[in-house]
Regions:
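Alpha-helical transmembrane segments and their helix-helix packing motifs
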Residues: 1-180
């Protein structure tokens, strides 16, 4: 296999500053959603087992308030509040907004995974009072994994893929450094 000849067939995509910004933040926001949910549930499980203080390290890592007067209201705000810019729902909406702008480069097929995650968080918010919302979070995490796998295996220009994955891995380093 002549890799050099094959690499010459791929032209570099024109990457404007705004496109690079959208790709980068798409990667960051999708990673923020995925990692936050994966880190959230072990702490949440311990709280449900009657240890409210177990959630404080998670809150501290994300610079969230640690004194919860109403823990349920705090959780609802953290996961579902569309007016809270630090909520998981807001991160999904931000990812979706970036993905929509990039539809010509990424394709509708890849955009659908972010859109499905957004639908799932909205549905989870509607069911939060009934404790049925927890199951939707697995779907959201799965949609993020499907999105990244789809990007990796798509014919999207490697330069564009790189911007997404740079954002993704920088967010991962940031979050895992916080969580320790």
């Amino acid at each position: 296999i002549n890799l050099l000849a094959q690499s010459r067939k791929h032209s570099l995509a024109l990457v404007t500053a705004s496109k690079a910004d959208n790709l980068y933040w798409l990667g960051r926001y999708t990673e923020r959603v995925f990692t936050t949910l994966n880190q959230f549930f072990p702490f949440y499980d311990r709280v449900m087992d009657t240890d409210v203080d177990a959630f404080r390290p998670f809150a501290r890592a994300l610079d969230l308030p640690e004194d919860f007067q109403d823990f349920d209201a705090f959780i609802h705000s953290f996961l579902y509040d569309e007016k809270n810019p630090d909520s998981v729902r807001s991160a999904i909406v931000y990812a979706f907004n970036n993905a929509v702008i990039l539809r010509p480069e990424l394709s509708s097929r890849l955009l659908q995974y972010v859109e499905l995650a957004m639908s799932s968080i909205v549905e989870a918010a509607d069911r939060a009072a009934f404790d049925e919302d927890i199951y939707k979070h697995r779907d959201i995490a799965d949609n993020m994994l499907a999105f990244w796998g789809g990007v990796e295996n798509s014919p999207v220009d490697p330069t564009l893929k790189s911007f997404i994955f740079v954002g993704k891995y920088l967010e991962r380093v940031d979050l895992y450094t916080r969580f320790g």
